[in-house]
Each structure stands twice: as C-alpha cells, then as structure tokens.
Design a protein with these regions (language model features):
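C-terminal interaction-tip segments
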Residues: 1-24, 31-38, 44, 50-51, ...
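Terminal beta-strand-rich extracellular "head" domains
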Residues: 49-98
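Solvent-exposed, conformationally flexible loop/turn segments
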Residues: 11-27, 37, 80-94, 106-108
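Noncatalytic modules at the cell exterior or secretory-pathway interfaces
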Residues: 42-43, 102-120
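Positively charged, low-complexity intrinsically disordered regions
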Residues: 6-8, 27, 41, 64, ...
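Exposed aromatic-hydrophobic patches
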Residues: 29-31, 93-102
C-alpha cells in the first residue's frame, strides 16, 4: 500500500533552499512523518510555477532532509524555466512531474522538503508529494 504526503509553499529566494511547510491552508506540521511501517520513498510528484516577472534561465531542485532518511540528505532536480520578454497575459498550466525513486527511510521519523531555484525568475510556488511504501 502506498502513502502520499504533500507540502507546498513559496520559493522565496534564488540560490537558497526554502522549506515547504504548508498544506493549502490546513493545519499541519512543517515536516512529514514517515508512515509507520514504511521503508522507502518510491515516488516524487512535484510541480512549480512562477509569475515569470524577471528574465532569466533557472533550474529548480528539491532537497529532502531529516532523521527519516536512512542515508541522509537527498537533492534532485524537479524542473527548469526560461523567461525572455514580458509576462503580460502569458497564463499557462504546468503539469506535475513524477519521478520513480528508491530512497530508504525510517518509519515514524521526520522528512522535511525544501525547494530552490538558481536564478530569480519571479515569485515562485512549489508543491511536492512524497510516495511512501
């Protein structure tokens, strides 16, 4: 059986990981408790959006940390964006990406999610779901 745990939030600065510590207005802890009995993270579902307010080319990465990770901190790319020109009326939908992983974890311990972009391309929001088994 798979368990899905999500956190979301604003990515507030370039070249600095920002913790994802919200759940769409619901009361929750900042970190994710690994479901009891789970031994690994088997999937990542991630999406990111920006307002494209600043021209630039950015790569975006996610970082997992905490005592719920058997092998320590993990960092992986979740997207990229290029902005050239004005963002007037350029609304678009970004579908989430999925990534199959095999990250060992410790049941009932904690995992924190954070996201960073290497270049400021405007205000950014990210959401990441971890799939535990």
């Amino acid at each position: 059986m798979a368990f899905y745990r999500t956190r979301e939030g604003a990515v507030t600065a370039a070249d600095s990981f920002t913790a994802l510590d919200s759940l769409y207005g619901q009361s929750t802890t900042a970190s994710i408790q690994v479901p009891a009995g789970s031994s690994q993270i088997v999937g990542v579902i991630a999406t990111i959006s920006t307002d494209s307010a600043t021209n630039g080319a950015a790569t975006i990465a996610s970082q997992l940390s905490g005592d719920g990770l058997s092998n320590g901190q993990e960092t992986f790319v979740i997207g990229s964006q290029g902005v050239d020109g004005t963002p007037a009326s350029n609304g678009m939908t970004n579908m989430p990406m999925t990534l199959d992983v095999a990250i060992p974890c410790v049941g009932s311990n904690q995992v924190s999610e954070a996201v960073a972009m290497d270049v400021d391309v405007g205000s950014a929001q990210a959401s990441i779901t971890l799939v535990f088994a």
